[in-house]
């Protein structure tokens, strides 16, 4: 952990490579009192960040992006052994992280207010930093989702305490070393950024509850997100939570395109993506064609060591996660689900699995977070819409059709934060608004939108008469 410019290197928690279970490092586990002290230090540095000019913040962010670019391959390898993500996907994550910092740099110089005239003068608005941002991040995109919180916070001029998942903290430690180097080069006090490692029920809980935190940004499970809403008090919160994202395929769709999109949308990071395809809702007339084509492609996926360049599917984040998914597959089959391919577990690897199910099956109503694709046949577009909306989740959805009127109808009527037309739900560019409704979250990320969430509007009234 990194607090006020000091590294603390206790070996409290083992960090293991989920693919082979080898120990790759250790991290300290902060106590609640240590967490409180770190938050106090970060609070004392709020004015330091606020007083940095937009140009200095821009230069900090661009320099971080530059340092990341120098070591892309090494950083990608660390993501892979940290998470079990195939190396070619880890390289993409590093590239996206660089872009996230560059976008944040751009927006750091685009902070704008308004002028509103009235008879005796004018109203001026300006955006000011909220103060101290607490960032809690997940394991599945341990570098880019970390960047999606800290980069906008820096752009807006906030101090930061960041708590990465204890399942995949090693890459955030490397990023923190880069941030330390950049801050030192700019002669900025290091207490503006603090990395707090440890157990979520201690470190994360204190960040959530502590009144010195002005803004909390959390990515993780619905269960923890719901708990946060009850504990956070009056601080601003952004929650990026789970999803059971429907991919709707109508009978006029380009089936080949739908298959390709579903392959990338379902099996990226072995299905451990919050916007992964959760279920396919497909009209009867084209269901057989789609199933036959996607099964053919799934059987060609390379399963194995995530460091191999041609690997497509590797381990889940832990053996416990894989065993949970195995039980879900078996329960689905017990409820009448038809296993089309896969269904096999080998240690922490779940082989790519396709099942045909009905709407009352367990897999139709939960976030699976694994390379498991449930397919549900529907009679028409209205049934597809109703089934898609019959969910507590509301993150992303996808619709495949060649009829613009149908596409716009679904765009208007799907109860989701994002609607993708002729694309799977698993699409995100790093400067678009991103987030869900219902139990899938509160607020929006995406650099400009995260900056808005991490700022306050100050209104200045000038009487000129």
Curated annotation (Swiss-Prot):
Pathway stated in the Swiss-Prot or TrEMBL entry: Cofactor biosynthesis; coenzyme F420 biosynthesis
Chain residues that bind NAD(+): 220-225
UniProt catalytic activity: (S)-lactaldehyde + NAD(+) + H2O = (S)-lactate + NADH + 2 H(+)
CDD domains reported for this sequence: ALDH_LactADH_F420-Bios
Record keywords: NAD, Oxidoreductase
Signal peptide from the UniProt entry: none
Active-site residues annotated for this sequence: 240, 274
NCBIfam families: lactal_redase_Meth
Quaternary state and interactors: Homotetramer.
Protein name per UniProt: Lactaldehyde dehydrogenase
Species this chain originates from: Methanococcus aeolicus (strain ATCC BAA-1280 / DSM 17508 / OCM 812 / Nankai-3)
